[in-house]
Amino acid sequence: MTKRYFSLLAVCSAIATSTFADDTPTNSLSLGKTYLRCYPQADSNQWDCAEYSSETNLPIGRSQIQQAPNAYDFVSAENLTPAAQSALLPGCTGMYIDPLGDQTNAPSPENTPLIVEADDSVLTGSQKAQLDGNVQISQGARSIRADSMTYSRETEEASLAGGVTIRNPGLLIRGDKASMSTTRNQASFENAIFVLHGQHIRGQADAIRQTSDSSIVLEGGSITSCEPGSNAWSLGGAEIKIDNEKGQGTGKHITLKVGKVPIMYVPYIAFPLGDQRQSGLLFPSISSSDNGGLDAAVPFYWNMAPNYDATITPRIISGRGAMLEVEGRHLNKSFYTESNIAYLPNDDGGQDKDLDTLVSNGDITESQAHPYTGQNRWLGHLSQQGGSASNGGWYSTIDFTKVSDQDYFRDLGASSFSEQNQSYLDQRAELGYLFEHWTVSAMAQNRQVLLYDLDTPYRRAPQLNAIGHYSVNGFEFKLDNELVRFDHPSNEWRNGDTLITGSRLSTDYRAAWPIRGRWGFIKPEVGYKALGYQLESDGLASSAESSPTLGAAQASIDMSVIFEHRGGSIMQTIEPRVYYLHRAYTDHSDLYAVTADGQNVNFDTSIRTFSYSQLFRDSRFGGRDRLDDANQTTVGLTSRWYSNNSGRELFSASIGQVFHNADRRVGLNGEELNTGQTSELAADVSVMLGPLSRFYVNSIYDTEAAEITRASSGVYYHSQDLSTLANLSYSYVRDYRQSSIAAGTTEATDIDQVDLSFVTPINKQWSLMGRYNYDFTQAQELETFLGFEYNDCCYRVRLLARKWLDSNIASLTDNHDLEHDQGVFFEVHFKGLGGSGAKVNSILEDSIRGYQERERRNKQ
């Protein structure tokens, strides 16, 4: 309590000095039932009090101080207002409600009168005042209640007895007895309980000391976020300090109990209150897998300043050793920076029974089974966003991630950093400036490959861009210039031959005249693309051109008309679209087979995946090493159905095809091209099955072979509160190929997979979750897990049993029984004491569509 709150106690002295003169008899004098309203004098140390003859004369504000509905101000869900019910967190059966309500806009207590009420008041001279029977003192939103109260003017101390209750906004304290001192600015309560309404935290103690409006100290007490009647977990000890204003708690000689069972002791602890992040321990994540054994991580959050913090996570992996992970964040007016480092010294090599079986059978060697034994393994990551690109001026971007080896994430994962399902780790830095019409930038980029069967991309060291945009009298002009220096982390290709390196200048200049309206759009465009190279002579064939140049003019027109039909509650549109593209052929022979081993000049280019959206692109290649010739017309048709009431799209269907007016001649690697007169048929369908569910189909159909070459379909559903999620998808690709930088493609294979994932509540506290991902081509499971979540206001527990394909073992054996890892992942989060680990969250967010949004909703 602060000095302004202890002015409540001074009213007892005010009663004596304002009611009687100095010659008041020294013997006791009873005044009977007392109603007083007091205002501070100018010096704020003396009071003017006026007595009211009856309770009806009390000010309106007095009636707002109501007796609490129960000891903890806990209101069950059925008795909450509709607004409070909608804010009730999952698993909670009610919430702590401050009877004073929201005091955000209430007047300051210093500007409100002090109200005193008692059944009887007794004065002993001018030094002692006693209030007896239903003592109630209030000033604004602050109040004191007790059966009796005695104040000594000489010692400036007060004592209260019998059902003592003190309220501040968001804080309730009750005790059998209390003593207060205006000189020490302190109040203490015996055999007391307290509630922090907003943080959903309560506690009890042998004694509670209140040193400010928002700070209390528990002696011989405990705290919990569990609802009244439950002590599933509690944090208790010799001394616990709660600072509600800072959102932080500290404790000495603390024991964490689950029920009545102590599970952890620490001599000192700092912890956050609620889910806001303050310095202190976060709760651990524990998992076990075939590969690493038992894995336990205990994060510590360090709030160093309002604009920078760190999370330090010691981890112990039984099969590999002890490691440390550190995440740091920094924010100022110009930059946001995030960094991660992790280090595992002297890897023990892991423990994998499947690999040991292969070693015992003589299928692989010990070094193949445990290639990192004795090695130091590490991760480094830096991400930075700087400047203000949206408002013009300078901007910068850094996205750099590097690991010690390709198997780092497979073996170790990361408790505070996620790079799940990544083929590459980007290592990129960019600096740019936005002018009114131009954007200029310089960028350097490298990528670390995480998969063994992928080629390592070229490095860009550096890349310079200058892109201009102008609009003049309805015409739009784009001037795109790019200069890149390409080299390679390895000077030699896998076969030992020298890789092609060099520089490339590319330009793409365009002029368009777009016309748009409710009826549709039309966009004629002309342009010219050019390429120029300066190739390093090392490795080039004697007949190869070291400075090849290419150029091609192009023209296109894209147009669509929208026809609408309204009938009843539905509006239907028919949207035909026609796109014509012509680009002149330019000879690419100077880019093919320029080395003795037949390498082609191809730094960053691949064939785009064909889809409905690809129908209306101006190139079939991704990248800038090819100027593909084109003389083609694309015809597409889209129909949409909208609800006239809600405006939602209920149904959409699109179908389209490219008609080639001439054979294509430019290929990726100089190969003979398909000279068919039409492309495959592309179609997309999306159907809203209900307000919260949608079905989709995307397919590519080869009209010549009369077969589907690529298809994906699925249905997904989520409940209004996101407690239920359900996803089912199917994907098929015939003859899937991966492009190679040097010479063509890898071996073709089919992809034929189904993926089912879900989260469904069993009741208010229990939820079931799972995933089943199966590959029909290989006749094996890619990932399967089943788990449950228990979630109430007190704590959350998640347990997953997971089985997933180990790509490393799969490359060493044909035995499907040995190709999978299995693991159990466990996390517990004691609510009110900060966040939990990230491993289970990472698995669920990567595997179940909508889970990340579900988590975000649950924290609101």
UniProtKB/Swiss-Prot annotation:
It is found in: Cell outer membrane. One of its GO terms (biological process) is lipopolysaccharide transport. Its main location: membrane. It comes from the Bacteria. GO terms for cellular component: cell outer membrane; transporter complex. Residues 1-21 form the signal peptide. Keywords: Cell outer membrane, Membrane, Signal. InterPro entries: LipoPS_assembly_LptD (IPR020889), LptD (IPR050218), LptD_C (IPR007543), OstA-like_N (IPR005653). Belongs to the LptD family. PANTHER family: LPS-ASSEMBLY PROTEIN (PTHR30189), LPS-ASSEMBLY PROTEIN LPTD (PTHR30189:SF1). Together with LptE, is involved in the assembly of lipopolysaccharide (LPS) at the surface of the outer membrane. Component of the lipopolysaccharide transport and assembly complex. Interacts with LptE and LptA. This is LPS-assembly protein LptD. It comes from Saccharophagus degradans (strain 2-40 / ATCC 43961 / DSM 17024).
